[in-house]
């Protein structure tokens, strides 16, 4: 069975965190393709590590720079704004949870 590919927009807020908790309980059925946050780069980084997410968007420029410093894995794509959705959504995503 193929894993369902998911994007979680606003993953560091309360709805986003609840969504992530549900996904973690059923990891064999889901693959998170994208996580986004407005400001909370530390929580975004933690979620990306836990779920092996390769695409992150953080809207705040200062927090983007902090996240870039923190992420040592060059295989993780980090974007500073939502203009990069087109690049990411060329990948197949089955579900998008919009918690923003």
Kindly give the residue locations of the regions a language model identified.
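Generic N-terminal leader/processing signal
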Residues: 1-3, 72-73
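N-terminal Rossmann-like dinucleotide-binding module
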Residues: 2-54
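Structural motif
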Residues: 9, 35, 59, 79, ...
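Alpha-helical scaffold segments in soluble metabolic enzymes
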Residues: 18-21, 47, 66, 87, ...
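Conserved N-terminal catalytic core of the sugar/cofactor nucleotidyltransferase
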Residues: 43-80
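A structured beta-alpha segment of the ubiquitous adenosine-cofactor-binding alpha/beta core
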Residues: 68-100
